């Protein structure tokens, strides 16, 4: 478990952020699991149908956090913040952004099926904005901006192939998994 530094009974923000980076490896496992889900959705859309791709992403999305915890456990790593940690509440709030915005994505996709992935990319980008504070990593701002800008660009200028957004998002998440891991590892003293 991460070491929690307390000052006068209150945790410093930087210490709380470091705990999040260390516990979740800078988002490594979560980004990796998410990348796999997005690429599986892209594959389902590319080689079967958009409808199957949508189902894979929506249903798979509900399993991202439990699978992330499983991957962390499998790596012999802590898989959750300690009970009472100040970032637990923010993490829970951030986790609900995507499921609560799914009706919007489904409504948009009902009118413009090719906008399913771009709409979800934009919402995923917004979902990552609080990660900047929670992890104390500006890199999540870059990921967020790339997802939002790409989602808008694909919706407006490149709606075909329909699966492009899924493949691009999977690729970005995969790359940022290793960016986050590197940032988290740089926090660990090498002595």
Residues covered by each model-derived region:
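Short, Lys/Arg-rich, polar N-terminal cytosolic tail immediately upstream
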Residues: 1-23
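C-terminal ends of transmembrane helices
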Residues: 16, 69-84, 126-134, 177-185
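Short, amphipathic, aromatic/basic-enriched membrane-interface segments that mark the entry/exit
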Residues: 20-30, 84-92, 109-115, 132-141
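Helix-coil boundary and interhelical linker segments in multi-pass alpha-helical membrane proteins
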Residues: 42-55, 106-115, 155-163
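Membrane-proximal helix-loop-helix units in multi-pass membrane proteins
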Residues: 102-148
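Terminal transmembrane helical module of multi-pass membrane proteins
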Residues: 140-191
């Amino acid at each position: 478990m991460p070491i929690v530094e307390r000052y006068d009974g209150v945790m410093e923000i930087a210490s709380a952020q470091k705990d999040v980076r260390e516990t979740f490896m800078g988002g490594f496992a979560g980004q990796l699991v998410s990348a796999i889900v997005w690429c599986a959705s892209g594959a389902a859309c590319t080689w079967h149908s958009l409808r199957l791709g949508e189902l894979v992403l929506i249903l798979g999305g509900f399993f991202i956090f439990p699978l992330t915890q499983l991957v962390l456990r499998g790596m012999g790593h802590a898989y959750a913040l300690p009970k009472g940690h100040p970032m637990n509440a923010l993490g829970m709030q951030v986790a609900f952004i995507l499921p609560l915005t799914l009706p919007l994505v489904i409504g948009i996709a009902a009118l413009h099926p090719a906008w399913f992935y771009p709409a979800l990319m934009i919402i995923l980008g917004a979902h990552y904005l609080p990660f900047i504070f929670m992890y104390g990593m500006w890199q999540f701002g870059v990921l967020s901006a790339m997802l939002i800008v790409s989602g808008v660009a694909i919706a407006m200028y490149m709606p075909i192939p329909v699966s492009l957004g899924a493949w691009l998002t999977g690729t970005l998440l995969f790359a940022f998994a290793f960016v986050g891991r590197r940032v988290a590892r740089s926090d660990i003293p090498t002595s």
